[in-house]
């Protein structure tokens, strides 16, 4: 595939420079899969969008995003040493988290699955927020660890920018999904900066204690980011799997073993047992949070990918697991500084994967490596379809408000009830509503 220049719609011009902010700025922070990613060859200025894209998705993804974890640095790095992965910062960081595939086809068909923060950005602009003065975005390389310097220092820089551009006003962070975990890591690692720059933190659909069903299955079989007809054009489940096995961020969203779950998450496998070549039986085996590690190891022992004519082994990565365990320690210890208000929105009313089962009684698993080519059966709990409500509601921070909203994991970003809550907590309302209110008020006064 050729390397095609990727024009970015939106700029970082200073059209609002010099304006006096009339409100505290808002910084939108995306979650996993919620940022546009570009790649380019080193010593080249030409970039190609590799996430998200509908057309040629699999090819671009394999070429640029398949990676290997480097235990010496803590980063996951492209298989091709000549490739760099970048996050566009156009439109004050908003471009990368707005419409994740801003191609004409997506806009023409209005594929809402990739309209990420778009509706929320429009809502905030409609309430009087101005890009570059009181509204900013932070997209990042979501393959990386939530506590890695690249991400944490990037967030710090974006907070500093919002603080300065608004005339020294403290920032309201609105984070989605895994973005809430990164904010938690930042809060622990840079408490003074968090206190200096942040006034409020609104988090949406954050897997504070992990997302057991979805993450366990992602490690074993992958994930389908887009469902339905569009998935035919998109990154395949298995192509995605071969990336996620080497992503620290995925391991950091495994179920928290220190959390007191109502019921411990499990992985179940219907196993074929053979005492000799003739007698066989079928048993349902269960693996808890600790035992699942051995299951991951056995299931992924033969996992590999082909890249550039070479076979590359991709077993379960214990170096990433060790790194993720230290991240979990940070997440468990993080504390909200005095003077910062915390608000939590989490999804409810949707069947959400919790326990995962592979094989059936009539079609059992012989060798555990077969799991990776098996579609799972789930046991469901209440949640947003991705994160259990039990996890998303279990922030360890004292909340001004914690509200369950009926909606899907990504759908919450365009949910009217969520918008109402955000407007209430920010103390704003749409301009049209204000004008209507003022006109009514004048009529009353004139009487």
Curated annotation (Swiss-Prot):
This is Phospholipase A(1) LCAT3. One of its GO terms (biological process) is lipid catabolic process. Optimum pH is 6.0-6.5. It comes from Arabidopsis thaliana. The keyword Membrane applies. It is found in: Microsome membrane. GO terms for cellular component: endoplasmic reticulum; membrane. It comes from the Eukaryota. It holds the Pfam family LCAT. Its main location: membrane. It catalyses: a 1,2-diacyl-sn-glycero-3-phosphocholine + H2O = a 2-acyl-sn-glycero-3-phosphocholine + a fatty acid + H(+). The gene is LCAT3. Changing residue 384 to A: Loss of activity. The lineage of its organism: Eukaryota, Viridiplantae, Streptophyta, Embryophyta, Tracheophyta. It is a peripheral membrane protein. Hydrolyzes the sn-1 acylester bond of phospholipids. Phosphatidylcholine, phosphatidylethanolamine and phosphatidic acid can be used as substrates. Weak activity with lysophosphatidylcholine and no activity with tripalmitoylglycerol and cholesteryl oleate. Seems to have a preference for unsaturated fatty acids at the sn-1 position.
């Amino acid at each position: 595939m050729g390397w095609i220049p990727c024009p970015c719609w939106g700029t970082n011009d200073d059209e609002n420079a010099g304006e006096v902010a009339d409100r505290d700025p808002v910084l939108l922070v995306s979650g996993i899969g919620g940022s546009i990613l570009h790649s380019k060859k080193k010593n080249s200025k030409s970039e190609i969008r590799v996430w998200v894209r509908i057309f040629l998705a699999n090819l671009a993804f394999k070429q640029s995003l398949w990676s290997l974890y480097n235990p010496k640095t803590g980063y996951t790095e492209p298989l091709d040493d000549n490739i760099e992965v970048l996050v566009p910062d156009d439109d004050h960081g908003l471009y990368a988290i707005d419409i994740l595939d801003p191609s004409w086809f997506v806009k023409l068909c209005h594929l809402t699955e990739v309209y990420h923060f778009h509706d929320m950005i429009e809502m905030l602009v409609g309430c009087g927020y101005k890009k570059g003065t009181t509204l900013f975005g932070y997209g990042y390389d979501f393959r990386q660890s939530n506590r890695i310097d690249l991400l944490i220092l990037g967030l710090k820089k974006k907070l500093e920018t919002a603080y300065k551009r608004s005339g020294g006003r403290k920032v309201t962070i609105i984070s989605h999904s895994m973005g809430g975990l990164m904010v938690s890591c930042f809060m622990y690692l840079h408490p003074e900066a968090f206190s200096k720059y942040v006034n409020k933190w609104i988090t949406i659909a954050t897997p504070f204690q992990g997302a057991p069903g979805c993450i366990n299955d992602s490690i074993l079989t992958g994930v389908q980011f887009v469902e339905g007809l569009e998935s035919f054009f998109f990154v395949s489940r298995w192509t995605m799997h071969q990336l996620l096995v080497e992503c620290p961020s995925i391991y950091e969203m495994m179920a928290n073993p220190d959390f007191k779950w109502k019921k411990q998450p499990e992985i179940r496998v219907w196993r074929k047992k053979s005492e000799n070549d003739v007698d066989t039986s079928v048993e349902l085996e269960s693996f808890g949070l600790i035992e699942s590690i051995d299951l991951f190891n056995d299931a992924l022992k033969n996992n590999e990918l082909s890249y550039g004519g070479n076979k590359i082994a991709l077993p379960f990565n214990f170096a990433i697991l060790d790194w993720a365990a230290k991240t979990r320690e940070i997440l468990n210890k993080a504390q909200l500084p005095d003077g910062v208000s915390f608000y939590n929105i989490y999804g409810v009313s949707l069947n959400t994967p919790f326990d995962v089962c592979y094989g059936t009684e009539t079609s059992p698993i012989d060798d555990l490596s077969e799991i990776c080519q098996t579609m799972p059966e789930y046991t469901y709990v209440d949640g947003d379809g991705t994160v259990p409500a039990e996890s998303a509601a279990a922030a360890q921070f004292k909340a001004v408000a914690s509200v369950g909203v009926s909606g899907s994991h990504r759908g919450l970003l365009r949910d009217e009830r969520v918008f109402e809550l955000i407007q209430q907590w920010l103390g704003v309302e749409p301009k049209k509503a204000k004008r209507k209110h003022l006109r009514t008020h004048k009529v009353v006064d004139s009487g």
